[in-house]
Every structure is written in structure tokens, then in C-alpha cells.
């Protein structure tokens, strides 16, 4: 059985979801003969996890004595949804293949529950790729801090615009497309007041159902009169950090 190939299928399924602050998870279910009979993924925070999404599609018990492949250890706690580990045991799965153990102490423990129920568990399949997929989640949980990406644009000689400011783009279409992908992937966008005053950036993203926060660092309090109202129409919330002037 080529578990690497099936795990990569889980990774690709997982990428379809927009799950923050939860991890991205995909799942594939095989019958006793090794045929794929169902697949699922965690679509959105608060909705069914990948294992539940895949298993609830099966109505006739064809998953019994089968194998479940998932890129993250099945959860073992009651949160927005019941424990996936309980459902896996209930459905008679005999083997579970996992890429990464869950570092979150609140949700972990699924592997132990599965093994206690007599289910064979294999971990560490494409482990590094699994960690890369959920690097934001792992950083949040293990290091207790946000995962930060710096996006900057400059010319080959280190400039950001012409002296008179009349230059519009110094980046290519490919680079701007990359910026849009970053905006839809991350939960918060931070910029400076100088960027706001010079460009009045819209910070658009192309993915529906994204919930973003907008953070702006100010050297002063000057801003375009219509800027706050524009931001309110674009973002879930805004944070302003202002430098107080004394004297």
C-alpha cells in the first residue's frame, strides 16, 4: 500500500479548507480491500473535522475493517464537534495512518484511544511535509506566538519608488498574485501609516469567507478622512497603534 501517495492526497484535500485557528486536515477512507470509498476535509472552523466529513458520507458500513488516512492525529475532545476518535472506533476502522501527532494538549490523545480500542496506528508518514502544511498551527501551539510572513517589494538597487512618487508598480503580475494569496491565507494584515497615506491600499483578497483583522502602525494620527470608513467595509476588525506626542 502506497501510504505516501494517499497522504499527499490528504494534504491536497486539506488545502481546500480555510480553517484558522484550526489546522488544515484531509482524510481518505479505504475499504477492507484497499479501495478508496470516501474522502473529506475540514472546510471551516466550527464545521465537521476531516474524519467526520469522510465517515458520515458512508451509510452502509463499507468502512468496517478498513483503513483511514489522515494528516493529523484525530481529536479526542468535545469542542465544536464530538471527538473524531470516538467515531473512528464506532465505525469499525482497523487501521489509521497519520502524518503528524497533534501538539495541542487540549485535542491530543486520539492515538492512545484508538490503540486502546485495538486499532493499529501508524504515525510519521511524510511527517515533515505535514508540518510544513500546518506550519502556522504548529507555531501557534508549540511556540505560543503568531506565524509571521514579511511581504516587501523593492527594486534591484533597494528602492521602493521613484523620488517623485509617480511610479505605480515595481512588482510583476506574478508577485502581486503572490501577495493576494498571502492575504487570503493569513488572518491579519499589518501595514504602516506611510503606506496608507501614499497608496491608500485596498488590501483585497479573492477568497470568500475569509475573516481578517487589519492592523496599522502610525507615526502620527494623520489619515485620509474616508480611510476608516473604507476599512470598516473591508475588514472584520481594525487595530490602530498610535504614537503619542508629548511636549
Language-model segments: residues:
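Short, small/polar residue-rich loop motifs at catalytic or cofactor-binding pockets
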Residues: 21-24, 147-148
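Zn2+-dependent cytidine deaminase-like catalytic core
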Residues: 29-129, 239-242
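Alpha-helix C-terminal capping/helix-to-coil transition sites in glycosyltransferase folds
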Residues: 71, 184-185, 246
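Short acidic/polar active-site loop segments enriched in Thr and Asp
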Residues: 94, 227-229, 247
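Active-site ligand-binding patch in enzyme domains
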Residues: 139-140, 145, 149-152, 156-230, ...
Amino acid at each position: 500500500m502506497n501510504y505516501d501517495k494517499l497522504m499527499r492526497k490528504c494534504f491536497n484535500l486539506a488545502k481546500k479548507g480555510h480553517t484558522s485557528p484550526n489546522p488544515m486536515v484531509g482524510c481518505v477512507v479505504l475499504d477492507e480491500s484497499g479501495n478508496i470509498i470516501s474522502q473529506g476535509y475540514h472546510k471551516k472552523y466550527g464545521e465537521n473535522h476531516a474524519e467526520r466529513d469522510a465517515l458520515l458520507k458512508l451509510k452502509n458500513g463499507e468502512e468496517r475493517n478498513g483503513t483511514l488516512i489522515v494528516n493529523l492525529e484525530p481529536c479526542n475532545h468535545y469542542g465544536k464537534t464530538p471527538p473524531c476518535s470516538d467515531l473512528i472506533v464506532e465505525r469499525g476502522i482497523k487501521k489509521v495512518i497519520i502524518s503528524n501527532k497533534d501538539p495541542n494538549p487540549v485535542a491530543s490523545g486520539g492515538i492512545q484511544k484508538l490503540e486502546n480500542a485495538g486499532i493499529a496506528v501508524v504515525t510519521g508518514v511524510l511527517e515533515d511535509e505535514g508540518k510544513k502544511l500546518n506550519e502556522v498551527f504548529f507555531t501557534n501551539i508549540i511556540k505560543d506566538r503568531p506565524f509571521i510572513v514579511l511581504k516587501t517589494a523593492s527594486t534591484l538597487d533597494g528602492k521602493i519608488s521613484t523620488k517623485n512618487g509617480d511610479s505605480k508598480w515595481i512588482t510583476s503580475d506574478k508577485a502581486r498574485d503572490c501577495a493576494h494569496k498571502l492575504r487570503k491565507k493569513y488572518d491579519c494584515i499589518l501595514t504602516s501609516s506611510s503606506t496608507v497615506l501614499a497608496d491608500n491600499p485596498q488590501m483585497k483578497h479573492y477568497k470568500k469567507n475569509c475573516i481578517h483583522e487589519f492592523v496599522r502602525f502610525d507615526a502620527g494620527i494623520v489619515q485620509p478622512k474616508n480611510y476608516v470608513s473604507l476599512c470598516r467595509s473591508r475588514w472584520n476588525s481594525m487595530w490602530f497603534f498610535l504614537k503619542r506626542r508629548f511636549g
